[in-house]
A protein has these predicted regions:
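Short, surface-exposed alpha-helical recognition segments that flank or form part
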Residues: 7, 34-37, 71, 150
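Serine-esterase "nucleophile elbow" of acetyl-processing enzymes
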Residues: 1-35, 45-54
């Protein structure tokens, strides 16, 4: 999550790093995201994203913009799978965050899109968050006026969700 229309201190990477520090985990959280980017863009940036030799965990939350652009779930899945394989080959743990397509995309698209996250998480035995925006999506108090992107309060909720997964990995 790039922190669309938020001050840097409210970006997910900043909030998550703060949350980690508060509980005694001193990690540097790198924001490798780009606003509006797709899984293909994430794959293209992966070499740069993983260029830091000290990376231990990758939080992979791509695909929502693919859906918004109507990119076929098979194409998104292929990109995500390539990202997963490259990351695991480098012995970096992955927290894989899923998304959910709205019903307005039709049953076939929704089914293919929604199930690809669970399928990949099982296939590669990943730490899995079924829906990254759980508790945030469709809540006007936790989203910007566009109704799509989380606001500062929404980012706090998302950070807590990711933090629970990180604790499982580094306990």
């Amino acid at each position: 999550m790039s922190g669309y229309r938020l001050e840097k201190r409210h970006h997910l990477s900043s909030v998550l790093e703060n949350d980690l520090n508060k509980i005694g985990y001193h990690y540097n959280v790198i924001n490798g995201s780009v606003a509006g980017d797709t899984s293909a863009g994430g794959l293209n940036r992966l070499k740069w994203t993983l260029s830091e030799s000290s990376i231990e965990i990758l939080v992979l939350c791509l695909g929502a913009n693919d859906m918004l652009r109507g990119i076929k779930p098979d194409a998104t899945r292929k990109n995500l799978e390539k990202i997963i394989k490259i990351t695991l080959k480098k012995k970096i743990k992955i927290i894989f965050a899923g998304m959910i397509a709205p019903k307005s995309y039709g049953d076939n698209y929704k089914s293919a899109f929604d199930t690809m996250y669970l399928s990949l998480s099982k296939e590669y035995d990943l730490n899995y968050i079924p829906f990254l925006l759980d508790g945030v999506a469709l809540n006007p108090d936790l989203n910007l006026n566009d109704g799509i992107h989380p606001n500062e309060k929404g980012v706090v909720v998302i950070s807590k969700t990711i933090l629970r997964q990180i604790k499982k990995i580094i306990k």
